[in-house]
């Protein structure tokens, strides 16, 4: 082998090794996936963890109640069982906050699924993946059993959704979103929430209820949750 060819081969091998090490083992963006065993330091909330090294992990496929919302304490207490335990973390991506996005396995069980099964979260996903159907089935089971956030109020059935309009003209935040409900019961003291973190507390009197919104309802279609003052489900559009 000529000397020049020999050195070209060496350079190629070194470059390929560096590329493999960098892309396959460190990148967590796009379609890159990796599995690692990590120690959980603490549960920040029901769907966010701090792991060894100070990194944060956001559990994919679920959305648990935020602090001060109904069942927020139950959700975080459920997730606290991961503290000081070594788990298998399957990373799919990293979000804009620098959090690892992924799925957690403890004792060979998908923890994201366990939260849904117990009714401490609802299914929430920007993009379908290999676990989506599994998570949807877990959520359906909790809904049928009326566990956690799915436990129904005695006033469930009082409200009928007549309209949930988003801003169709593409101009965001112009107060053209509209929610219209029909209440066949007495005045209801409720909390209204969308698929994200928008929540408000209102009184819905008997009869027609209408309200305009801005920058709230998802243009691609949104969920609507309504709970009574004790945290029981009054209405859902899901």
Residue map of PLM features:
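Small beta-barrel nucleic-acid-binding modules, primarily SNase/OB-fold domains
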Residues: 1-238
